[in-house]
């Protein structure tokens, strides 16, 4: 794709997700989420992005399986457009957070977005590593359940059966589509470093190191919030029941 096409696709994506956010803002919001309507709309917009790009990334490999054999040079217009659209979303979300939230509360996500925009930007501008970028977007399959978890918590449904089921699916997809994907990408980068220029290899290595560290921390937070806490509450209930029987 030419530079003009990249700019048009990315710019259109920024506008599209702005419209999505605007449209979501017109829908009813749970009473428990009204005190932070901006966060509710922001997470809901992120959910839409994850749903679109998660499905799109799988379709890229289904429609163009040759890309899996060569993640550097081989790609389709369909997969290139996916990466450009994702850049547009991350630019939109970056600006949305900078404008509506204190940086001290969102610096981790802002830093994450800068890293992703940089890495994906190199890919779409050089028309190389597009397949590698599409592999990275497979993590959005997990993000669907991750964002749904946040929405359910804001709607005060953290104790519902649906939330518990989503937590289990979220944990499973986290391991498969985040941890395993990042591990595979790191291995691929190391094995193919002779085929990658030093600058791109350095950017990719630093980006993956940052993503891996952030995802390990997030995994611990999820475990502590959804499983360790539930386990402790269950133990406390059992202790109280024993005390009643005595």
UniProtKB/Swiss-Prot annotation:
Membrane topology: Multi-pass membrane protein
Chain ranges passing through the membrane: 5-25, 43-63, 79-99, 107-127, 128-148, 199-219
Cellular component GO terms held in the UniProt record: plasma membrane
Stretches assigned to the TLC domain: 35-231
Pfam families: TRAM_LAG1_CLN8 (PF03798)
Compartments where found: Cell membrane
GO biological process, one term: regulation of membrane lipid distribution
Main location: membrane
Function: Regulates the composition and fluidity of the plasma membrane. Inhibits the incorporation of membrane-fluidizing phospholipids containing omega-3 long-chain polyunsaturated fatty acids (LCPUFA) and thereby promotes membrane rigidity. Does not appear to have any effect on LCPUFA synthesis.
PANTHER family in alphabetical order: CT120 PROTEIN, TLC DOMAIN-CONTAINING PROTEIN 2
Protein's name according to its UniProt entry: TLC domain-containing protein 2
Xref: InterPro entries: TLC-dom, TLCD
UniProt keywords, alphabetically: Cell membrane, Membrane, Transmembrane, Transmembrane helix
Protein family: Belongs to the TLCD family.
Ribosomal protein among keywords: no
